Amino acid sequence: MYRVKSESDCEMIHQEQMDSPVADDGSSGGSPHRGGGPPLKKGPWTSAEDAILVDYVKKHGEGNWNAVQKNTGLFRCGKSCRLRWANHLRPNLKKGAFTAEEERLIIQLHSKMGNKWARMAAHLPGRTDNEIKNYWNTRIKRCQRAGLPIYPTSVCNQSSNEDQQCSSDFDCGENLSNDLLNANGLYLPDFTCDNFIANSEALPYAPHLSAVSISNLLGQSFASKSCSFMDQVNQTGMLKQSDGVLPGLSDTINGVISSVDQFSNDSEKLKQAVGFDYLHEANSTSKIIAPFGGALNGSHAFLNGNFSASRPTSGPLKMELPSLQDTESDPNSWLKYTVAPALQPTELVDPYLQSPAATPSVKSECASPRNSGLLEELVHEAQTLRSGKNQQTSVISSSSSVGTPCNTTVLSPEFDMCQEYWEEQHPGPFLNDCAPFSGNSFTESTPPVSAASPDIFQLSKVSPAQSTSMGSGEQVMGPKYEPGDTSPHPENFRPDALFSGNTADPSVFNNAIAMLLGNDLSIDCRPVLGDGIMFNSSSWSNMPHACEMSEFK
């Protein structure tokens, strides 16, 4: 239950409030005096009060402003004493208006700090924060009334330049710290020739080519075009063999990188010069290109110019037959190419088996690598030709491995003339009986390997006088094929098999040399009977003609 106050109770409470002390309103900013002493004084300071405060600060120093009232008997609060000393009684205070230099400094400081009056007063000795604030507020009102900008143009430009400089200094410092961190963990990768194996534009192997001279590798003609090829490969090998990091290795690394870039270009030139890229037709009237990379069934022989990746190859393989060399042959001939001893078996993989078709390049000046000229191959081929009359020869595979362009057969007008002549003399399919000496004469159980389609063999007319001089009663030797057989590829035409025949005519050897050194091997056709048709290479048209001789017995 609530107790209701009576009139007597209300009168007693009012009497107690009248007897309690009241705060002095005249005190200068201090809290109401609740003690038993006199009340604090408010209002402006008198000269007597200023003298008491100055004397106290000289004796006790600045600070502890609440003790002024106790020690001096001055009836002012601590806050009032501090402000009076800082704004009016300090000995280093500057009186009067601000100078032009002080005004310029205030504008610059305000553009950087804003309304930080105490911090700005620290940069202006003798000026108080209150004076700076009053000056700035007065200036803003004056500029607004006159329509002038608060900050002058010079101050704005200076501020923007300083900001950009600060940002650039920060970026430079950050980059420097990153460089120092990277320098502590410096890593230099090894540049090896193995990095170029996966590249379709590079060589299929990375041998130590220092053992192979340029003259033996590509001949004098190609060496003059890219004489810096061996130097670049040697530089790459030297970098790979280096064990430690030298202080001046940065210049060497830059040179190696530029050499590696040029090495890729030179490797493309090497591939084109050796004849691995594309082989053109020898007939000048035809522009059809026979791409590289067809597959031949039943051929695993060196006379096809193919290296087996499944069989190890030991020692140097010298693709040269001394008895068949000619002094006027092309120095870039494949017969002078010698494989380096450091060549490993696993490095003999044909890169075109897994690479896409490259862009057709210029016509190669090198002879076809199909004519290896090994004595064992000649003997074995002669034996196979005697027993291969009843064997079936498989058709050229339309494609090899992944990414390998299909094989293409290019026909020439001379081929049609030869076909018409053959049909008049011997009824039956022309291509089935026109089988050259090929590497396909080996067993058909051997797996197919990659091969190329060289240039076109051209047929030319032979005068009756020439036919008589070569012997009219003999026939041109060549293997027999059944009517149902398909002729093997003409790129493997081997006139070296003539040595295994029973003949002692010196012209046979001359004709074999002439046909062996021919660059442009082409269409499927064989020497035929009669006095009007014979083989002739487009690039070696001035060489002796092949004579007619009896078949193998």
Curated annotation (Swiss-Prot):
GO terms for cellular component: nucleus. PROSITE patterns: HTH_MYB (PS51294). Residues 65-89, 117-140 bind DNA. Residues 27-38 have a biased composition (Gly residues). Pfam families: Myb_DNA-binding (PF00249). Residues 1-17 have a biased composition (Basic and acidic residues). The keyword Magnesium does not apply. One of its GO terms (molecular function) is DNA binding. Keywords: Activator, Developmental protein, Differentiation, DNA-binding, Flowering, Nucleus, Repeat, Transcription, Transcription regulation. The keyword Repeat applies. Residues 1-45, 464-488 are annotated as: Disordered. One of its GO terms (biological process) is cell differentiation. SUPFAM superfamilies: Homeodomain-like (SSF46689). It comes from the Eukaryota. InterPro entries: GAMYB-like (IPR016310), Homeodomain-like_sf (IPR009057), Myb_dom (IPR017930), SANT/Myb (IPR001005). It is found in: Nucleus. Induction: By gibberellin in aleurone cells. Residues 37-89, 90-144 form the HTH myb-type domain. Transcriptional activator of gibberellin-dependent alpha-amylase expression in aleurone cells. Involved in pollen and floral organs development. May bind to the 5'-TAACAAA-3' box of alpha-amylase promoter. This is Transcription factor GAMYB.
